[in-house]
């Protein structure tokens, strides 16, 4: 019953035919999306990646062709040879580009059949995701996934073309390298030739791209696969793709302009014109205005409204008047009933209560108690009559979070040094400042409340409604991150970014005396509250790199064991350099409006890092293990 393709060649893709093609003889090939049998007339909706065309088999085609059409089922692979004609006006399908024409079949070849399907790719109600991942080759036939994968291709091409035009070389770096942990665990590859020794799959090409700058290539980029053996979390992939680049002799703004350029090219693939340059905000401003280092600018910033309250009023509310009193505004939500407020409180992080951080959400009650105060709060925060207003402040007794009294070597400030700048409603003082642990709890707690409220009301009040313009996408650069973070458990400093990030020149003298006061020349590009990419100006001097390793508690012996090859390379005329890496998967997910990374990756893993289609990972034979000198000592249940 099945036919060979022979020397038959298709003349058109299924989605290409238009009314102007009427009268042509065509050869179409693809999958049967739907079959409708009306007796003497059989309709086949023929599908390939370009779209769908309707083929009709009439009695004039002959008994053999009619019998073949009767045998065809959904997802059979067929070839149709016939003549195109205009549809009758009352049968035109305006929902598809080919809806004005149909192909009257003279010949039908069945190139392959199809078993009963576990689900249909044309179903409007999706099957369970595990089933779809197991049969990914069927799931990938869905039009939505086809559009996503095509978009991924177009975005990658746009980025490549832009960077090529800017003089960047696309250079491949090794996949099998040495283990130099950068935070997450490495995926290790055992060596058969050298028993007991291992390669590692790269978490990023970090050191190789820096070595390319030492080698004089000036501008490098790569759209590269990376691997991280992270703890299992929703919507994370153990292998992912990033847009990686490095530049010699840059300032941070040099990197910013390059990234803005290729993101503008990427967004143009969906018809969105981004406005550049992106605004900049220091880490300190982000924490003070948004309570997070990945601010979502689609929502109003928080505002410190202490000035609206008399001191005795705050004390009567058991609020500490010496600490920030933060107003959060959620647009267009209006006032809520007591029941609605009670339901909202269930969304707030439990640790707010543990830290004695108060959420004052009954503004009517506050206005009755302090009639002059709420109008001032609204003025300072920009809240309107249709907005929902919440105030977050510190209780007068701090219960802490189990870490009170534990301090880094340089004092009570956590997260290091911050540069303040101007902010909304005069919210951020000028000059240099530190945040105490208590202040940080308040800002971050308020930031969590702000996000919880936004997520709760997003759909109901169309907070994040997409309008198909650049205003849907609020991008910014966050700069001046702390160089180090204090680890309470280990009682030592860790690199906040990675240990190859350069400190600010003005802070070099604090590396040994006050590491918490050192700012990094690090920067993130953030879109609508999501980090798209992270980068920095790198250390190009061996003496400074050694100081950073020392500040991280790394002995000279450990430095040599882990990074000796790189420390050696730094001594051979290394130029100043810097770069960034952005997640391609996440960029495409945002552009596609997808809910999950798995919707824009052709062959993704589950949240448990399993490939259900090929059933990986799997045990290997004892012979393979013996060749590698490996013994399996036990399995951990996931």
Placement of each model-derived feature along the sequence:
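Class II aminoacyl-tRNA synthetase catalytic cores and aaRS-like
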Residues: 1-638
């Amino acid at each position: 019953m099945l036919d060979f393709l022979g020397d038959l060649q298709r003349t058109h893709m299924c989605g290409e035919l238009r009314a102007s093609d009427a009268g042509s003889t065509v050869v179409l090939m693809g999958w049967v999306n739907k079959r409708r049998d009306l007796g003497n007339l059989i309709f086949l909706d023929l599908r390939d990646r370009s779209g769908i065309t309707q083929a009709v088999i009439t009695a004039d085609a002959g008994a053999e062709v009619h019998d073949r059409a009767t045998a065809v089922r959904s997802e059979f692979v067929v070839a149709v040879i016939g003549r195109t004609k205009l549809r009758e006006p009352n049968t035109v399908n305006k929902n598809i580009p080919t809806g004005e024409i149909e192909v009257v079949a003279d010949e039908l070849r069945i190139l392959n059949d199809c078993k009963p399907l576990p689900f249909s790719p044309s179903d409007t109600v999706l099957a369970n995701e595990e089933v779809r991942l197991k049969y990914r080759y069927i799931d990938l036939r869905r039009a939505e996934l086809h559009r996503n994968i095509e978009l991924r291709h177009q975005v990658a091409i746009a980025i490549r073309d832009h960077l090529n035009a800017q003089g960047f070389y696309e250079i491949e770096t090794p996949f099998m390298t040495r283990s130099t942990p950068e935070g997450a665990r490495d995926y290790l590859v055992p060596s058969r030739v050298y028993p007991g020794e291992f390669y590692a799959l790269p978490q990023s090409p970090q050191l190789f791209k820096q070595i390319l700058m030492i080698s004089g290539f000036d501008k490098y980029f790569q759209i590269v696969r990376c691997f991280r053996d992270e703890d299992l979390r929703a919507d994370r992939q153990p292998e992912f793709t990033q847009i990686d680049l490095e530049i010699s002799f840059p300032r941070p703004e040099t990197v910013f302009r390059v990234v803005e350029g290729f993101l503008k090219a990427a967004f143009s693939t969906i018809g969105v014109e981004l406005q550049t340059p992106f605004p900049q905000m220091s880490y300190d401003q982000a924490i003070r205005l948004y309570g997070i280092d990945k601010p979502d600018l689609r929502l109003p910033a928080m505002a410190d409204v202490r000035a609206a309250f008399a001191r005795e009023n705050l004390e009567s509310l058991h609020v500490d008047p010496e600490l920030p009193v933060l107003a959060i505004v959620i647009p267009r939500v209006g006032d809520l009933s007591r029941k609605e407020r009670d339901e909202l409180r269930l969304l707030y992080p439990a640790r707010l209560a543990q830290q004695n951080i108060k959420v004052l959400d009954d503004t009517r009650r506050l206005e009755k108690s302090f009639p002059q105060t709420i109008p001032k709060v609204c003025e300072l925060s920009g809240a309107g009559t249709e907005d929902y207003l919440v105030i977050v402040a510190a209780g007068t007794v701090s219960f802490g979070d189990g870490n009170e009294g534990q301090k880094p070597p340089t004092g009570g400030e956590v997260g290091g040094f911050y540069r303040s700048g101007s902010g909304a409603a005069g919210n951020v003082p000028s000059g240099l400042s530190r945040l105490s642990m208590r202040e940080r709890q308040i800002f971050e707690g308020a930031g969590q409340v702000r996000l919880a409220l936004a997520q709760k009301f997003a759909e109901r009040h169309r907070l994040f409604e997409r309008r198909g313009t650049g205003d849907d996408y609020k991008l910014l650069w966050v700069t001046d991150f702390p160089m180090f973070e204090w680890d309470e458990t280990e009682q030592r400093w860790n690199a906040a970014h990675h240990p190859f990030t350069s400190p600010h020149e003005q802070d070099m003298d604090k590396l040994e005396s006050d590491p918490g006061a050192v700012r990094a020349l690090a920067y993130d590009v953030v879109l609508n509250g999501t980090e798209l990419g992270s980068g920095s100006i790198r250390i190009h001097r061996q003496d400074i790199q050694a100081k950073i390793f020392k500040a991280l508690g790394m002995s000279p012996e450990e430095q040599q064991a882990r990074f000796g090859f790189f420390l050696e390379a730094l001594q051979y005329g290394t130029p100043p350099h810097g770069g960034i890496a952005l997640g391609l998967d996440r960029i495409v997910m945002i552009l596609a409006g997808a809910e999950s990374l798995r919707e824009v990756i052709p062959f993704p893993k589950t949240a448990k890092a399993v490939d259900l289609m090929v059933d990986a990972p799997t045990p290997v034979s004892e012979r393979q293990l013996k060749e590698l000198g490996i013994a399996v000592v036990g399995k951990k249940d996931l």
